[in-house]
Amino acid sequence: MFLIALSLPLYAVHSVNQPLNMWDLVATVVCLCGIVIAYFADTQLYEFVSRNNKLKGLGKPVVSVLDSGLWYYCRHPNYFGEQLWWWGLVVFAWSLGLGWTFIGALVNTMCLAYVTRLVEDRMLKQESRAEAFRVYQKTTSVWVPWFKSSPSGVKNKNA
């Protein structure tokens, strides 16, 4: 039922016969960016997990935190890409006067916010990763890709 409700914006957009406008172009760009970001983030995560599984199988230490590629700029770029997709669909529907479609994207955003918290709590419970992940949390944006910040309490090496 939840997935059907989330898909209602697609139905709404395709049920109206209107010519394309500027907002459709904006929505298309947002949706495509979301798909590309989610794809590359998920691919990078898969490669990270696979590499760590190989290292673990060889008895070597694993890398505690994925902080390269898109993961350098935010802690959950895959979720960011997914959010771009859903909010892009809202832009499509909104331009057709179907503003109610934002409800699905909003519910999805709230669910991912909750899942984000669960994932991060799980990372902090793993002793081998907790310290590195705390630094990663302090220096890296949660969802929206942004520049790194310096962790508080860590002195600059050049000072």
Stretches with model-predicted labels:
Residues L6-Q44, V49, N53, G57-A159:
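Hydrophobic transmembrane alpha-helices
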Residues M1-A5:
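Specific transmembrane helices
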